[in-house]
Each structure stands twice: as C-alpha cells, then as structure tokens.
Amino acid sequence: MKVLSSLKSAKARHRDCKVVRRRGKIFVICKSNPRFKARQR
C-alpha cells in the first residue's frame, strides 16, 4: 500500500478504485486490482 499526499491521481488509476474514509484516514481501495491500494497520512 502506498502512502500518498494526493489521492486524486490514485483514484484515476483504475475504474474500480474507490475513495473511502476509515479511522480518520482516507484510503483508496480497489477490489479488482489490489495493487492500487493507497492511503493518505
């Protein structure tokens, strides 16, 4: 999982990517291609 300062580019990497908020952190999850997972500090 990558830690990114901006998730806008991470969301655009794949059409299944979703931005979710968990435990006060913002995550990008991607079910079909989990390699694109990312989070913001």
UniProtKB/Swiss-Prot annotation:
GO molecular function terms listed in the Swiss-Prot or TrEMBL record: structural constituent of ribosome
GO biological process: translation
Name of protein: Large ribosomal subunit protein bL36
Keywords: Ribonucleoprotein, Ribosomal protein
GO CC list: ribonucleoprotein complex; ribosome
Organism of this sequence: Stenotrophomonas maltophilia (strain K279a)
Gene of this entry: rpmJ
Assigned protein family: Belongs to the bacterial ribosomal protein bL36 family.
Transmembrane regions listed in the UniProt entry: none
Superkingdom of this protein's organism: Bacteria
High-level lineage: Bacteria, Pseudomonadati, Pseudomonadota, Gammaproteobacteria, Lysobacterales
